[in-house]
A protein has these predicted regions:
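Aromatic-rich peripheral "rim/lid" segments of glycoside hydrolase catalytic domains that contact
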Residues: 32-57, 61-108
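Short amphipathic alpha-helices and their capping/turn segments at secondary-structure boundaries
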Residues: 6-21, 59-64
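Conserved small/polar residues in nucleotide/adenosyl-binding loops
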Residues: 1-4
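Structural recognition of the beta-strand scaffold that forms the well-ordered cores
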Residues: 19-24, 69-73
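Active-site environment of divalent metal-dependent phosphoester hydrolases
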Residues: 28-30
Length: 108
């Protein structure tokens, strides 16, 4: 996960002193997507482990930033027939997200 992006965002958050959430946080299950998680055109081999590892790294990096108040996970389809590479349902990343959200709920 690119910590320099968090540094860049932190400057703006501190300047304006406003709450911050990631309205869309996600990474495809395509090999190489952890380097460019916002590139939805990336083609390649499916890599569920890379997607799960990206979520672990993102949560780990963000928990060190007290100004990060939440995440909207992209993509959570309403139908499994329309499952995209960003979808986490029935993939290892789903368990990573569930564990993180459960941990956060216990610490409230």
């Amino acid at each position: 996960y690119k910590r320099q992006q968090l540094d860049r965002i932190e400057e703006v958050v501190k300047k304006y002193q406003k709450p911050f959430i990631f309205s869309e946080a996600g990474c495809m299950n395509i090999h190489g997507s952890a380097l460019v998680p916002n590139n939805w055109e990336l083609q390649g081999k499916e890599d569920d482990a890379e997607q799960a590892d990206w979520y672990l790294a993102m949560f780990s990096a963000c928990e060190k930033r007290d100004w990060v108040k939440g995440f909207g996970i992209w993509d959570w389809p309403g139908s499994m027939e329309r499952k995209s590479p960003y979808a986490v349902c029935d993939r290892p990343a789903e368990a990573v997200i569930a564990e993180e959200y459960s941990r956060c709920a216990k610490n409230r």
